[in-house]
């Protein structure tokens, strides 16, 4: 029994190794549940009981899978990595939803799975109408799911699997990583994972310290730090960040949302004092330029429509909204819907684009937009000068035709999924603008609320079928669509 699914010479999917690693992931998830359990005990809340029960069950099942599914063949191929990446996020959400079902403010199975998937994918959409009624333990668990999902479940687990072959680690890394290029930041993926999570943790601790200097308690500082650096957007208050009425808090969150939207490869370069390389990066400069461009347009709309109410209304408030939307964080600091139809239209576009690849953000990624713009310029130049010898380069690296085709295919499927989600909600009787905004939010892992979702971004109005569809769209968006879609191809399952 110990060497279940051991087929060293087989070309079939290595189910034994997949279950072995999945068992380790479940043990990691069980360990994370200790934090909200401790929080419940500190605040004298009864929700420590479901956390203790669920953590124990998750640990036992994970340990059993890790022990019995321990194959001789430890090689992971590309198909294995893609399957494991998809299954891991679903399994994490299935066990992660149990605290929401067994707590003092229970959700049904549709709502609980939606909430867990929204957390782990850092979407930030919620079905909880009044989060302030939840226990501190549940609020901590919501925030923690986003912190875990920020860099990725697979990436975190790779820090604890030293025995996994490097090619297998690379397959898992690519299956979960985002963008048109995947940089290996270290010789071994396990070392890369430790480096990234170490940096992620340091930034989180720094953010907690800075938030504690403002008008916000330690518990809320920890929760918002988890959901800010992960660009997730869950809050401990129904009105979100607006409840604090603090320019300082908004400024700190803008700074770290911006950092969360930057490729961690660039952050490591900055850490190593390679600032010149950071500034020369095409995508980083376009990221800055995009924020500046949208800031000018949003401020112009605010002034034109007479919504100027003081210096905050034309400085930190529009900047907060832009960075929140572009980085797919989804924090709300006020009623931005009142700024006019232009701002709503720009918000759609910002949600679509997203920030940099290799960051914690959702969306199509600025990297792809940079490639499309450069490719468009190249095509126009070739049309004028047919014999022109040139290539499409991003950050000094040539993007070959195969990568270009992948970008085009991704944009097409990404847009199709948004349309599909919008049509599903329209068919269920929701207004067309609200339906497509909600679909945008889920596919781009954004979570911003507007229209029927309101400032709280609550999706409790959705019927059960709508919640399951939106949950699937969140997962597709987090795994950059292609990884999930390939599982439905018959050729994927052939040896």
Model-derived features: where do they sit?
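Membrane-proximal intracellular helices of multi-pass ion channels
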Residues: 1-495
């Amino acid at each position: 029994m110990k060497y279940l699914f051991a087929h060293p010479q087989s070309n079939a999917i290595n189910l034994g190794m997949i279950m072995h690693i999945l068992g380790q992931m479940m043990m990691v998830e069980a360990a994370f549940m200790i934090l909200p359990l401790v929080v419940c005990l500190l605040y004298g809340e009864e929700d420590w009981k479901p956390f203790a029960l669920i953590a124990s069950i998750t640990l036992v099942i994970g340990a059993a899978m890790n022990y019995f599914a321990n194959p001789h063949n430890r090689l992971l191929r590309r198909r294995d990595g893609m399957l494991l990446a998809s299954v891991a996020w679903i399994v994490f959400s299935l066990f992660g939803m149990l605290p929401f079902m067994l707590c003092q403010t229970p959700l049904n199975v549709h709502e609980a799975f939606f909430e867990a998937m929204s957390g782990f994918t850092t979407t930030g959409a919620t079905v909880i109408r009044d989060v302030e009624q939840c226990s501190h333990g549940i609020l901590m668990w919501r925030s923690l799911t986003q912190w875990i999902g920020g860099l990725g479940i697979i990436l975190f687990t790779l820090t604890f699997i030293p025995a996994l072959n490097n090619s297998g680690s690379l397959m898992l890394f690519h299956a979960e990583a985002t963008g048109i290029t995947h940089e290996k930041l270290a010789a071994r993926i396990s070392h890369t994972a430790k480096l990234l999570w170490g940096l992620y943790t340091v930034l989180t601790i720094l953010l907690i310290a800075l938030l504690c200097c403002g008008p916000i308690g330690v518990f809320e500082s920890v929760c918002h730090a988890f959901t800010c650096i992960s660009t997730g957007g869950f809050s401990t208050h129904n009105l979100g960040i607006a409840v604090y009425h603090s320019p300082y808090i908004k400024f700190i969150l803008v700074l770290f949302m911006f950092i969360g939207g930057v490729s961690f490869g660039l952050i490591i370069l900055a850490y190593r004092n390679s600032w010149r390389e950071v500034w020369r990066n095409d995508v980083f400069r376009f990221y800055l330029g995009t924020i500046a461009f949208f800031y000018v347009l949003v401020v112009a709309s605010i002034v034109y429509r007479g919504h100027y109410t003081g210096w905050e209304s034309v400085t930190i408030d529009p900047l907060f909204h832009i960075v929140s939307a572009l980085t797919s964080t989804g924090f709300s600091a006020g009623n931005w819907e009142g700024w006019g139809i232009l701002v709503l239209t720009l918000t759609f576009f910002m949600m679509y684009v997203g920030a940099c690849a290799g960051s914690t953000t959702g969306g199509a990624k600025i990297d792809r937009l940079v490639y499309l713009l450069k490719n468009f310029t190249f095509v126009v130049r070739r049309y004028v000068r047919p014999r022109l010898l040139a290539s499409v380069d991003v950050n000094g690296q040539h993007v070959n035709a195969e990568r270009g085709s992948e970008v085009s295919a991704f944009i097409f499927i990404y847009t199709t999924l948004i349309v599909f989600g919008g049509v599903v909600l329209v068919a269920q009787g929701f207004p067309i603008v609200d339906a497509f905004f909600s679909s945008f939010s889920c596919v781009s892992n954004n979570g911003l609320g507007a229209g029927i979702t309101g400032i709280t971004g609550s999706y409790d109005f959705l019927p059960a079928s709508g919640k399951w569809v939106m949950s699937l769209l969140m997962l597709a968006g987090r795994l950059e669509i292609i990884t999930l879609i390939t599982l439905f191809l018959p050729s994927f399952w052939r040896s």
